[in-house]
């Protein structure tokens, strides 16, 4: 492979690469090349390609060095020619930086080395050439420390130990009686270099390398090695960056911001990364190296006068003190500022996105070290995209694709005040199950959440080992939910997301004692009534009350949603069980209800007694009496839903969970039911025990209930049809779709459809009127997917219940997966939680097969998805490619799904 080009040079407004070569040169290398080509002042250098990273892991360090040597030596000569300095020279030594750069930005995840090329001879030459020995020795000290850490592995022996270099620095400062690194003299710095080298020799058994070429090869290989360090691996997992991409290595001539009062270093953004405002902003430090800006050793100053004045006001600093002690770059170096401002404008217009730029001013000359598309908040993301669309920088399609669907979550939920969160005490961390911020007093039981709200008007934090459907009302009345057990798709997580309610689940360190009503965690004891705060976006739980603020859904958000609707070809519905849920979903742009779970209605108010009367009855007659009480309640619920959706389709799922979920479990409830039904307490206890199942998720539930107790299906069908006809009579169009759950055999579905059709015809005869309705099924049993051609003979639509379909296909319990999921992710057995991200190769194949077979029988068959995957962007993309008509998700995930559907359509084109 001798003809393969592995090194690309840049400098003096020329480059062998360009900005489109991100896969080969990484984001940093591609942008450095592109900045050269458009005339931006960039220190010369070269980039070693990402392909060499793969060779490093397949061929080994020594082989890669030999392969690279000719090209790297030639590229270094190019830097020497452009700078007038020579690598390893005793008079005019060239110093370089060595940095990583993957195709996707991974800030801070991999290692960087500055001032490479320094040795005992070079430091004297630099001191003589600059007339600044302190600068020279400080640069040497920094290099030995950085190289020792990154390349030579000079780490603390144990986690309790201090960094070996920092320990030496602290000892030197104590010896000299000073507090800051900047107070150390030239002689102090010389002593530090000697001590650093001695520490390297003692810990590694090797001398610190003096040869610049040995230093360079060590650094290049260390950067490749850092691609597989723990933090880089974790970052890639969190951001879905494939390990096979690899990293490039960029080697650049050093420029120094710490050469005196006419030098500086800084970081800037072409727009505000927090708000999206079109305001140039950033920070800089005079006479400093890049790391000093973020190290907090000195107070960085603002680049613009406006920014400087805003900062001073926030710090209660007078204008007089600001101007004298913390002036802006514009005031200190007006000519350089003007050039920097012109460059940031040029870069933003050229790259057509908000830019994050790093710069150094060396002796009055401005150099750009990096530019990249800046990271931003969800609010800033939307504002920048819509502003750039209005400014004519980008078109509609680019504006839509520029906005990440998952980041919309940040706009839809309350958030913590940024200042308050910095001072908050984290007591435990769980799973970020539902985004948002919540603060309130702790309660342990659902009824107490209701009670606290009713008596004080204050919403509480409901803390449970795990939640159940009976906790629904309490969850609704709570500010947030915290559970010790359960994953991202546990009951608490799913219901909380549907409510737009903040939730942290699976906080396994919590020791919850219901009897004493206390939580013990990490040395803290929290009692009922004590305040805690939940961060549903990070999973962190804070002690006490942390201030929150409402998220602002601006006009830009609405405009983005309009554009998403314009380009998406797949519809988005919502999973909604109440008129309030439906109204919220409609406000977010849902085009129907893809799942209304009728059982959630059974837990409200006095209804639960009627439900319990029905399940505890010994015969059909008794069940029918109880169902007669439920009929008007269910009918009223459906009327509210149909009205809220204003003519959009509504899928109502018939009763799905096993009956034991509704059973009275406490002695108080059981005695109450005995009195209501006129039977003995012992009879109630016996019936509850009879209802208990060993494996209820695969037991007497779904269509199996409707087929063994047809009167349940009859009542629900009547409630649905009558409600639809009542709403139709008010002039509102109604599109009813009745869904039969847990079908695995077409005969099960046919039996249920016959009941529904019979009841519908009875109601039509009674009313002397008709409505259109459809009967379909939930595909959640694998057998239904592989026999979809038979199922479609009966079903008029399919809705994939991917929560249960995932459970039954993978054999994973979604409530217990948290026990082994982290290990499976770490070992790369699974790439993602299959209950969050659809398993395309397994569950996805069943979906594709069912769609294909179903439409083979019934070409016009409408297919959708109603599991939690319906709101996850990559799963929405899969649904688009699989040919589904719609996805359905929690109301607060509707905007995310709409944007993801638009992305899928645009990316396919």
Predicted features and spans:
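Short beta->alpha connector loops at strand-helix junctions that form conserved
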Residues: 46, 484-486, 505-508, 596, ...
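Flexible, glycine/threonine-enriched loop-and-boundary segments that flank and lead into catalytic domains
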Residues: 231-269, 438, 446-448, 455-456, ...
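Conserved alpha/beta-domain cores
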Residues: 99-100, 553, 563-909
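C-terminal accessory/binding modules appended to enzymatic or scaffolding proteins
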Residues: 14-22, 434-477, 843-859
């Amino acid at each position: 492979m001798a003809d393969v080009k592995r090194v690309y040079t840049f400098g003096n407004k020329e480059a062998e690469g360009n900005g489109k070569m991100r896969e080969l040169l990484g984001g940093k290398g591609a942008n450095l090349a592109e900045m050269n080509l458009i005339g931006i002042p960039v220190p010369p250098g070269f980039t070693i390609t990402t392909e060499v990273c793969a060779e490093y892991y397949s061929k080994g360090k020594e082989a890669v060095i030999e392969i690279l040597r000719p090209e790297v030596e030639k590229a270094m000569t190019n830097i020497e020619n452009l700078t007038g300095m020579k690598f390893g020279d005793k008079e005019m030594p060239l110093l370089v930086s060595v940095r990583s750069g993957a195709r996707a930005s991974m800030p801070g995840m991999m290692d960087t080395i500055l001032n490479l090329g320094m040795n005992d001879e070079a430091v004297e030459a630099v001191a003589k050439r600059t007339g600044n020995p302190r600068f020279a020795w400080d640069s040497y000290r920094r290099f030995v420390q950085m190289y020792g850490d990154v390349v030579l592995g000079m780490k603390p022996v144990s986690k309790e130990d201090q960094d070996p270099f920092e320990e030496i620095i602290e000892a030197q400062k104590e010896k000299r009686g000073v507090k800051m690194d900047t107070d150390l003299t030239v002689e102090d710095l010389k002593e530090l270099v000697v001590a650093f080298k001695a520490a390297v020799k003692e810990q590694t058994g090797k001398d610190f390398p003096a040869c610049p070429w040995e230093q360079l090869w060590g650094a290049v290989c260390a950067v490749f090695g850092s691609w597989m360090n723990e933090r880089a691996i974790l970052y890639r997992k969190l951001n879905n960056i494939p390990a096979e991409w690899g990293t490039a290595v960029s080697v650049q001539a050093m420029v120094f911001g710490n050469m005196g009062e006419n030098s500086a270093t800084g970081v800037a953004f072409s727009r505000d990364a927090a708000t999206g405002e079109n305001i140039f902003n950033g920070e800089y430090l005079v006479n400093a190296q890049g790391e000093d800006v973020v190290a907090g050793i000195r107070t960085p100053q603002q680049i613009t006068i406006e920014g400087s004045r805003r900062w001073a006001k926030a710090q209660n600093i007078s204008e007089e003190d600001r101007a004298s002690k913390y002036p802006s770059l514009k005031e200190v170096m007006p000519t350089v500022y003007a050039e920097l401002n012109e460059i940031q404008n040029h870069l933003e217009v050229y790259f057509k996105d908000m830019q994050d730029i790093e710069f150094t001013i060396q002796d009055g000359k401005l150099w750009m070290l990096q530019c990249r598309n800046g990271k931003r908040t969800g609010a800033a993301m939307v504002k920048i995209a819509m502003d750039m669309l209005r400014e004519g920088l980008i078109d509609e399609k680019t504006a839509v694709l520029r906005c990440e669907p998952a980041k919309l979550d940040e706009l839809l939920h309350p958030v913590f005040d940024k200042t308050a969160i910095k001072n908050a005490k984290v007591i435990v961390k769980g799973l970020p199950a539902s985004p948002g911020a919540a603060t309130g007093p702790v309660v342990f039981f659902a009824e107490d959440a209701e009670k606290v709200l009713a008596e004080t008007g204050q919403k509480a934090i409901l803390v449970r080992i795990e939640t159940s459907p009976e906790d629904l009302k309490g969850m609704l009345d709570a500010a947030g939910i915290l559970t010790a057990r359960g994953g991202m798709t546990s009951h608490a997580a799913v219901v909380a997301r549907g409510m737009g309610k903040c939730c942290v689940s699976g906080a396994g360190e919590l020791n919850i004692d219901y009897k004493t009503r206390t939580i013990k965690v990490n040395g803290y004891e929290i009692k009922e009534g004590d305040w805690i705060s939940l961060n549903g976006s990070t999973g962190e739980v804070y002690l006490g009350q942390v201030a929150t603020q409402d998220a602002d859904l601006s006009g830009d958000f609405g405009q983005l949603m309009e554009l998403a609707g314009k380009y998406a070809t797949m519809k988005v519905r919502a999973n909604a069980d109440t008129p309030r849920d439906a109204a919220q979903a409609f406000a977010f742009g849902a085009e129907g209800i893809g799942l209304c779970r009728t059982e959630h209605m059974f837990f409200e108010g006095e209804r639960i007694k009627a439900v319990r009367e029905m399940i505890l009855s010994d015969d059909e007659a008794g069940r029918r009496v109880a169902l007669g009480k439920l009929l008007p309640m269910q009918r009223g619920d459906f009327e509210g839903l149909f009205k809220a959706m204003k003519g959009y389709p509504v899928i109502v799922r018939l009763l799905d969970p096993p009956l034991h979920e509704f059973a009275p479990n406490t002695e108080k409830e059981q005695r109450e039911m005995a009195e209501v039904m006129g039977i003995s307490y012992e009879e109630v206890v016996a019936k509850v025990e009879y209802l208990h199942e060993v494996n209820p998720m695969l037991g007497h539930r779904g269509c199996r209930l409707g087929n063994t107790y047809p009167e349940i299906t009859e009542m629900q069908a009547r409630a649905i049809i009558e409600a639809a006809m009542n709403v139709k009579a008010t002039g509102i169009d109604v599109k009813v779709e009745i869904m039969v759950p847990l079908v695995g055999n077409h005969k099960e579905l046919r039996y249920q459809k016959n009941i529904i059709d019979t009841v519908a015809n009875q109601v039509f005869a009674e009313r002397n009127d008709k409505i259109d309705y459809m009967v379909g099924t939930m595909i959640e049993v694998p057998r239904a997917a592989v026999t979809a051609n038979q199922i479609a003979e009966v079903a008029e639509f399919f809705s994939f219940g991917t929560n249960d379909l995932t459970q039954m296909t993978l054999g994973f319990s979604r409530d217990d997966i948290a026990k082994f999921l982290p290990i499976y992710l770490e070992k790369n057995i699974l790439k993602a939680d299959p209950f969050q991200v659809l398993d395309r190769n397994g569950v996805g194949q069943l979906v594709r097969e069912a769609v294909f077979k179903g439409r083979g029988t019934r070409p016009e068959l409408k297919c959708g998805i109603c599991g939690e995957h319906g709101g996850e962007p990559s799963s929405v993309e899969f649904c688009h490619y699989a040919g589904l008509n719609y996805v359905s998700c929690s109301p607060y995930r509707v905007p995310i799904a709409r944007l993801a559907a638009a992305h899928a359509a645009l990316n396919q084109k």
